[in-house]
A protein has these predicted regions:
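Alpha-helical transmembrane segments and their immediate juxtamembrane cytosolic regions
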Residues: 1-245
Length: 245
């Protein structure tokens, strides 16, 4: 499916619309996970309705990650240079770490909790090598052995690095890549894998609906806005947690 921009509007959702859905649901989730969580923990807010609101926001946030997983696999498929793509993810992993720790751990550095860009980078590193293997052999058995070993290696790395979504996140991304030719099957598998981390990931299945409506067009040129938004919004939430709660 082509991702080229086109002047003719296709029915369905563009890549930009998917990104906005992911950003909005992610922001709702992170607002709850950082600001509301610390407010509740510090008895800054004690009304019982806030706890219900907190959980509702976390459930809404489950929609974001499957969309990001789908967009990552699309990026791996259509990027001109997957190694540059990996480097970009790695740079933003480093940029995002202090804001992430501020927002989630009320600390400037927490060795036991790394941001999701590390998870994405590990998965993309595995996918990049899978693509190289695919170029060198057409034997299904060899390809599948490489897929399993690379997915396992990246997942183990995520587990020991304590990345966001841990090994489950990496497995979900690798599965989405391996099954990419069937979008719905890929995302059903992805969301099922995410259930390993928490029963709340049942809400992740909602993301399949907008993904199914994706029409293959990128939309506008806002690539770096979506990258910078992640550390920027975490920094804002982190400052609120650090100085106002």
């Amino acid at each position: 499916m082509s991702q080229r921009n086109t002047k003719t509007k296709k029915p369905g959702l563009t890549g930009d619309v998917l990104k906005w859905i992911a950003i909005i649901t992610m922001t709702i989730d992170h607002l709850a996970a950082s600001v509301m969580y610390h407010a509740l923990s510090n008895d800054f807010i004690i009304h019982p309705e806030y706890k219900a609101t907190y959980w509702m926001m976390r459930f809404i946030g489950r929609i974001a990650f499957p969309i990001y997983i789908f967009l990552i696999t699309e990026g791996c498929r259509y990027t001109k240079n997957i190694w540059k793509y990996l480097a970009r993810l790695s740079v933003f992993a480093l940029i995002s770490e202090i804001p992430f720790d501020m927002a989630n751990n009320d600390s400037f550095f927490c060795p036991d909790d790394q941001n999701v860009f590390f998870t994405l980078a590990l998965a993309v590193a595995a996918i990049a090598i899978m693509k190289e293997v695919d170029k060198k052999t057409e034997k299904p058995a060899l390809r599948w052995v490489s897929y399993i070993l690379l997915s396992a290696a990246a997942s183990v790395a995520a587990y020991f690095l304590h990345t966001d979504y841990s090994f489950v996140g990496v497995l979900a991304i690798c599965a989405a890549w391996i099954l990419r030719e069937n979008r719905i099957a890929a995302m059903l598998t992805t969301c099922t894998i995410l259930l390993i981390s928490s029963p709340s990931e049942l809400f992740a299945f909602i993301a399949i609906w907008p993904i199914a409506l994706y029409n293959g067009t990128k939309g506008s040129k806002l690539k770096y806005f979506f990258y910078f938004y992640y550390p920027a919004h975490l920094l804002i939430f982190g400052l609120i947690v650090k100085f106002l709660i």
